[in-house]
Design a protein with these regions (language model features):
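Long, contiguous internal "core" modules enriched in hydrophobic/ aromatic residues
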Residues: 101-255, 269
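N-terminal signal-anchor module of multipass membrane proteins
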Residues: 1-54, 60-63
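Juxtamembrane non-transmembrane "cap" segments at the membrane-aqueous interface
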Residues: 264-286
Length: 366
């Protein structure tokens, strides 16, 4: 029972990470296409500025839960996917560096360099996460000892690449909707146009990915055995359709919420289709690491569940406060050189001041 609970929580942590850091990654990927001027690029940085590092808490949480609740799965996963996960790690490091270093020097060439780094450092995780999870859905060549018998190029199969493109498009759509919420004027118009342009591509990719899933994986076995699970792909489809409907009505926060629902539905569709498998072996089904043969002791799972019941709500409350505080669009006033973060503790239950989301990344004043 505890193994099942932790499997669902593990899935939820990944889903929350994809929802929250997904718009950051999508926003960074859109930077060279939508940021036409220096001011617009600064708008885009500040649309993600207060959120991106807090969002990565969920990635750390998902990795930590994998390590603590499913140590065998953690060992096999990080061994088999060592190369893509290492690239992912370096990409996230350089993304953080690009946020901090971009405006340290008053030079167009310097800023252009870090804009390029920022773009690549956001693009790479979008694709790598899709490739990694698609291969987990399909199964990877690991033996009973957990030894990986494959290569990095072996992960770049048709289904893996389809997963990479799928995740990229999913995050770009999510990021475009977020930018439309956080911007005004021409930048908002282009963000809405980007979301509208990407949406039909996303719908087509969803159909293609679901079809490929039937040929390359055994995810549908769980759904055929328990038809009630089909609510998950239907939830994803409803979220995607709802996003388009809300965009057309100009209800941007609802559109973003529907996009988040789409991401959650996609994540649960894939991972719950694997259950109880976590690392499916394509060499020998008996070598598959499951939530039951790869979990920690019952005592460990009980203690962790108690900690999670206390800490997860605290993190959610903190992030709710943060998102509420910085919920307004970024304005030109926010980009003032002397702008600063308002402490805002008293704003938790009140409407934030118009300038409470002051620029996180401004021009260097040196």
């Amino acid at each position: 029972m505890l193994e099942t609970i932790w499997f669902v929580l593990w899935t939820l942590l990944w889903a929350v990470y994809f929802v929250l850091d997904g718009f950051d990654l999508g926003l960074g990927t859109l930077l060279p296409f939508l940021g036409k001027t220096e001011q617009e690029r600064r708008f885009m940085y500040n649309a993600a500025g207060p959120f991106w590092d807090g969002n990565e808490v969920w990635l750390i949480s998902a990795g930590g839960v994998t390590f603590a609740a499913f140590p065998k799965a953690y060992a096999v996963m990080f061994s088999a996917l060592y190369a893509p996960l290492l690239i992912l790690l370096f990409a996230l490091i350089f993304r953080a560096v690009s946020f901090e270093f971009r405006n340290k020097v008053e030079s167009d060439a310097w800023r252009s360099l870090w804009d390029g780094v920022h773009f690549v450092a956001n693009l790479a995780p979008c694709i790598l996460l899709g490739v990694a999870f698609a291969n987990l859905f399909m199964g990877i060549p690991v033996d009973a000892q957990g030894v990986y018998h494959g290569s990095l190029l072996g992960l770049l199969n048709l289904y893996g690449l389809a997963g990479g493109v799928f995740f990229l498009c999913m995050f770009v759509l999510h990021g475009a909707i977020w930018l439309s919420i956080k911007s005004e004027g021409d930048l908002q118009t282009r963000a809405l146009a980007a979301a509208t342009f990407v949406w039909p591509i996303m719908l087509a990719l969803l159909v293609v990915f679901l079809i490929l899933t039937a040929f390359y994986t055994k995810l549908y076995d769980n759904y055929l055995a328990m038809p009630a699970l089909f609510i998950l792909p239907l939830l994803a489809l409803a979220g995607l359709l709802g996003a388009r409907c809300m965009l057309s009505k100009g209800k941007l926060w609802l559109a973003w919420g529907c996009s988040a629902l789409f991401i959650i539905g996609v994540t649960f569709f894939g991972v719950m289709g694997m259950f109880p498998g976590m690392i499916i072996s394509s060499l020998d089904p008996a070598a598959t690491v499951t939530a039951f043969n790869g979990s920690s002791s019952q005592l460990t799972l009980k203690i962790m569940l108690g900690v999670a019941l206390v800490m997860v709500p605290i993190v959610l409350i903190y992030q709710f406060w943060m998102y509420r505080l910085f919920s307004h669009p970024v304005t030109a006033k926010d980009l003032d050189d002397h702008a600063y973060y308002l402490p805002g503790c008293a704003l938790f239950f009140s409407k934030p001041r118009r300038n409470s989301g002051a620029a996180f990344y401004t021009r260097s004043s040196s």
